[in-house]
């Protein structure tokens, strides 16, 4: 019987006993204690314990709080029996004033003088034994992703680091945790290569194990987390991706070690990364203790299956996937069905394809700075009136919701439309249809690099001004380049459409094209994503308290949804602007009349949102 194989058959209690005896066969605990949760441990002076516990509750993704001991307590009854936490881990780290000063196989072995790295700190007396130091300390136990590895394997998902006989790869990101007191640090993540075809399996399995960090916090390009090179992890070993694998990142409890280092507390101890405490808690458990009455983050005793996240590809370059709950996906699919009906026979089906709406909403949700571009002329003669009635309502609906979500929004139009569009936008602000004025730009067609210069700072494709371009009623996004009267307008593709086409080749900028009604649906879809806890957790990387959306915030988002009243006011403004209808080519006076079909679409879109709870939280 091989040594590694025999260890994998042992129970957590048997493995803890071997570690207490300093068995040299046990180092990294990944792959051990199948079917049980593992935990990280942090020993801190009692005076820092309250702040550190609050730090954990403010950053529940990486710091899944399991148990806090009493001062000097070496056992942890809710997690395991017959435990001495001073000896039952294979390797410990000793920290002094923000530095790792040594590693130990047992905290009971350290009785010599503990050197102090900072001249500003009081030195630890040589006569003080470790037991005296530990008597003033509190031990905090945190969840570990090793706890979901066996479930992944059972579901057919390869665990590459175990296959390769390595510790998991751990990286310091540039994403800041929510600070509390002296504790402030960047998020640390683990990376596991997952076959693209098995992403949803891995997401669901880990979501169902919240004690082991839950679902991933990022899937795709490491640079989006500030990780420059996967071959150089900050902790653990480099794990090789196999063909077809995607890098998937989970929040990691080693974040706690980074917090200890940055806090520069005089003395602290922890497990060594990858050398975890083995609990007796099954990996199927979602909670281990009853929350205290005043707990800000009570554990989930029952996970709602409708909130199970699904993964969706958002961008190839850079590679980015997003997560959203089954419930939100179903509602956005319903929105998509409504706008795909084209009741006014305006040719909007040319701008519609299955799953486009969800992709558009996810791309916008991940964006910070968005440019909304407009449709092109639908007449051959520049002297004739132009069709901008089709895009303005949808563009304003998108802009309203994006602004309420705190994103930067810029409207971009053809220079021939500038004066008219500005007047309409200003009037929309005055009427309260548009929440606030937004920058309005044009693309000059006098320069061959005009589109690139507008999209990127100084025309440098590595410095894009926007991370998403959405084209409303932009016929260049249709495969036949035709207007709604089925006339080919390819020869009329102007600077605005050139902007959209140029953006598609710039890394870091995603693009989508929607119809006018698609603009309304996007606004509703963004509302659904921002009230979806699974999606919000992913956007926030598992950081921040997991509380329900405030009523004030929810009301603001609701106020910025499309409405029948807003559409009627905007139609009135458009009718006064001398525009013509894109389908008939006739005056807008009759064509812009608010019809029962128009009322019906908006009402049905809003009904999808209001059905059931306003928020999934």
Residue ranges of model-derived segments:
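An acidic, phosphate/nucleotide-engaging active-site surface
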Residues: 111-116, 423-503
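Short, acidic/small-residue loops that bind anionic groups at enzyme active sites
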Residues: 151, 158-168, 392-394, 398-406, ...
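Short linear loop/turn motifs
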Residues: 162-172, 273-277
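Surface-exposed beta-loop interaction hotspot
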Residues: 172-189
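Short alpha-helices
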Residues: 486-546
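A C-terminal functional module that forms or caps the active site or interfaces directly
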Residues: 550-554
